[in-house]
Amino acid sequence: MNDQTQFTERALTILTLAQKLASDHQHPQLQPIHILAAFIETPEDGSVPYLQNLIEKGRYDYDLFKKVVNRNLVRIPQQQPAPAEITPSYALGKVLQDAAKIQKQQKDSFIAQDHILFALFNDSSIQQIFKEAQVDIEAIKQQALELRGNTRIDSRGADTNTPLEYLSKYAIDMTEQARQGKLDPVIGREEEIRSTIRVLARRIKSNPCLIGEPGIGKTAIIEGVAQRIIDDDVPTILQGAKLFSLDLAALTAGAKYKGDFEERFKGVLKEIEESKTLIVLFIDEIHMLMGNGKDDAANILKPALSRGQLKVIGATTNNEYRSIVEKDGAFERRFQKIEVAEPSVRQTVAILRGLQPKYEIHHGVRILDSALVTAAQLAKRYLPYRRLPDSALDLVDISCAGVAVARDSKPEELDSKERQLQLIQVEIKALERDEDADSTTKDRLKLARQKEASLQEELEPLRQRYNEEKHGHEELTQAKKKLDELENKALDAERRYDTATAADLRYFAIPDIKKQIEKLEDQVAEEERRAGANSMIQNVVDSDTISETAARLTGIPVKKLSESENEKLIHMERDLSSEVVGQMDAIKAVSNAVRLSRSGLANPRQPASFLFLGLSGSGKTELAKKVAGFLFNDEDMMIRVDCSELSEKYAVSKLLGTTAGYVGYDEGGFLTNQLQYKPYSVLLFDEVEKAHPDVLTVMLQMLDDGRITSGQGKTIDCSNCIVIMTSNLGAEFINSQQGSKIQESTKNLVMGAVRQHFRPEFLNRISSIVIFNKLSRKAIHKIVDIRLKEIEERFEQNDKHYKLNLTQEAKDFLAKYGYSDDMGARPLNRLIQNEILNKLALRILKNEIKDKETVNVVLKKGKSRDENVPEEAEECLEVLPNHEATIGADTLGDDDNEDSMEIDDDLD
């Protein structure tokens, strides 16, 4: 064999591997086929074999070629025992001589792997193998010449398996992915794609930079550019170009020594500059290149950008561009900004429709068009902190995944019976092992076998039905995948002007598979129609599925809102008045505002806002809670701000977050953080008159435009809130009037007090100012019933099952002493606790009342312990025992305490 120093490292590796193959197969001589077999072995670094790269570039079947080579390799006679030394054959010597001649002709310093390959092509046995594998040698030669380009082999390490070694490692060829149909179709965004292409066609500074919020589709625009390049729908300067996406993670990974990262990056740039084909480099998150001083990759990029030797597309968000890229003026001016806006709901629906087949094929489900419309609408309404179309795509993807997982899992009916059968079979095995069994065991075994046979009989039709339904869906999915592959092949053939292949696919293969899909769809539809509600497999994603997904992600019962919202809103007053008693004017005002908003007649940018005025304990805060519970089925969907905590000037920062430079800047404010993730909420400002005037100033833009700006500069949308403010201003005028209904004169006095305290611009922005009535005796009786019902519900939540039964006299007692002019109905809760719950606790501990029993409460003569019951009343409530006490109680009473105190005084 020739001197080893004449070969490059890769060529020498191939020769060494060929010797090993000959030794492993016990062949006496090293022949050209061993060299060819070494070419198809995967290198130690895991890269694609050189010959595989050439064959696949020529669009030949590499797997078939590999089989032909291995088949010819095993046909060579073996020598037993294996030879001690393997000698090269005459044919191999001729190959190496030809390789040396080719090296000299190309004026290279070393024999490279392509020299050896070209020499192999001259061997008749190798030519026969290529012919058998249906691979054209001339086409492979042409691919090898394109791969080499103008590169000279002037060092032993200059050989490469790929034309663009650095780019193949640290970048992704997006044009190749588009050619193979691996990219999703880009719907819309024509203007942004055209703008990007216009900038790329410039003579200098041909570097667009896409700027927009995360999730609006910046990368999709680049995919659209790649698609247009392979379709030749670009200016002449870009025709035949390649678009690579730089993988910054791969570029950085493993660069442990100083200079490794820079060397890799410069290698990428050098390959782009030296390439005969125009290469456009896309750098996502381009602000990541900006670093510190000499280690900054942006500084390596600047010279190439300034000389116009490089076309780069950047993408970043508004915040990163402003805070990082703009600070380096020299880097920024080399790029032309292209603003990318968030698509509208209508545009998002169009995007979803374009991607619908991809998601149907991936998940094997059927997506209804109504599901796509619902996804776009719900994503816009309930996920405002995310951006379209990303949020809508997530809703569709999660819903499809949920349906696919449920489909691939066994139905509950089938799974339950199979588990029963498994348990019976285990029991049978255990009974069969008992050889000396008595008659009882034998009877049990007989019964178990009968039950097993019965379950098998029940399971057989269930399994058959399940397998038939599942097979139909799987077959349909496979047919759709096949259609997608054929469409991509047809497009590729049309691009290569391979009219024969394109015609065969367009007029024969594709119509056939479409007919098959139609037939399968009819079969599946017929099976679903026949099964009806008893279908074992659910394979459809509809609007309800999307609503359930949105409800899980947001915590808002979206499904219920969308189904029965109209009926709920019509009867809103009836439902709220059963919870909040005696305040019909306030309930009507809130109900009208909610109906106006939901029907789309209200100002979409202005939230419904209310100022509730009235006595303490009249139900202002309670109404806010019930509105949240009514709209969202959860009273926790209310954001409560106690304005008594906001009486200082600096309290504004509690709501909005501190400004830059202050401690806690990154944490944000209480109000802005809550509204960002709960945009559909009831926002309660309790006791708003106690807030500092600057807090009210901040609320002006929220009440007028439905937005507030956080300390970090983010605009928070408040347009979907219901803003409720409560105040006790003018309470003395309400308290002094006769009767429960607010009189016109009292209303004027209260409004006068309100105007004295709040500025006109604040009051003018409020949708409705409502004055709450004084609670009448009739209203107090209703409140008593509501509170007792709430206590029973609280028992259930604590896993206690007591039923309260109060006599009418006992309820009258609670209504009489549970209300005061100063505190409204607030004393009622304390009265119930002192007169009923405390006494009930003692009865329970003494086992006089047990779980799931009725608690009887009566009025009796005696002294009450509640401060709201005057001493001269001489009446209180008594909880009657249902059983005799099993635990003795302390007999020392209140009277005994007082007597003992008097004795102590006498002794003193």
Curated annotation (Swiss-Prot):
Consequence when changing N728A: Almost completely abolishes ATP hydrolysis at NBD2, but does not affect nucleotide binding, thus keeping NBD2 in an ATP-bound state. Reduces stimulation of ATP hydrolysis upon substrate binding
Residue ranges of the region described as Repeat 1: 7-76
Motif (Nuclear localization signal) on chain: 773-789
Coiled coil: 412-536
SMART domains with a match to the protein in the record: AAA, ClpB_D2-small
UniProt cross-references to Gene3D superfamilies, sorted A to Z: 1.10.8.60, Clp, N-terminal domain, P-loop containing nucleotide triphosphate hydrolases
Domain-related comment: Has 2 AAA ATPase type nucleotide-binding domains (NBDs) per monomer, a low-affinity, high-turnover site (NBD1) and a high-affinity site (NBD2) with a 300-fold slower rate of hydrolysis. There is allosteric regulation between the 2 sites. ATP binding to NBD1 triggers binding of polypeptides and stimulates ATP hydrolysis at NBD2. Nucleotide binding to NBD2 is crucial for oligomerization.
Family: Belongs to the ClpA/ClpB family.
Name of the protein in its database record: Heat shock protein 104
Lineage: Eukaryota, Fungi, Dikarya, Ascomycota, Saccharomycotina
